[in-house]
Amino acid sequence: MSKRPTIDTTHIMRRAEELISASSNRYRITVQVANRAKKRRRRENLEDFEDAGMKSVMQAIIEMSDELTQPEIIGE
């Protein structure tokens, strides 16, 4: 059984706060993160993907904050 890598929760919280502060509607950004995490989880289940160590919600927060700070990611 492999151990999950340690995740810096303060880093995740900072990114979540960045998303919330950049959004005009706190509820809407929360729902968007939840929907992205839900899609990721479904995809992982369909592909029989082993959990990479990070919860889908945390991964969604990181992805969305990256898209916010690096808009060139979206264009690709």
Curated annotation (Swiss-Prot):
Domain of life: Bacteria
Entry's Gene Ontology molecular function annotations: DNA binding; DNA-directed RNA polymerase activity
InterPro entries given in the database record: DNA-dir_RNA_pol_omega, Pol_omega/Rpo6/RPB6, RPB6/omega-like_sf
GO BP term, example: DNA-templated transcription
One Pfam family per UniProt: RNA_pol_Rpb6
Enzyme Commission (EC) number: 2.7.7.6
Annotated catalysed reactions: RNA(n) + a ribonucleoside 5'-triphosphate = RNA(n+1) + diphosphate
Statement: the UniProt record of this protein carries the keyword GTP-binding: no
One GO cellular component term: DNA-directed RNA polymerase complex
Keyword Nuclease found: no
Keywords per UniProt: DNA-directed RNA polymerase, Nucleotidyltransferase, Transcription, Transferase
Chain's role: Promotes RNA polymerase assembly. Latches the N- and C-terminal regions of the beta' subunit thereby facilitating its interaction with the beta and alpha subunits.
Oligomeric and partner information: In cyanobacteria the RNAP catalytic core is composed of 2 alpha, 1 beta, 1 beta', 1 gamma and 1 omega subunit. When a sigma factor is associated with the core the holoenzyme is formed, which can initiate transcription.
Family from the record: Belongs to the RNA polymerase subunit omega family.
The protein, known as: DNA-directed RNA polymerase subunit omega
Native source organism of the sequence: Acaryochloris marina (strain MBIC 11017)
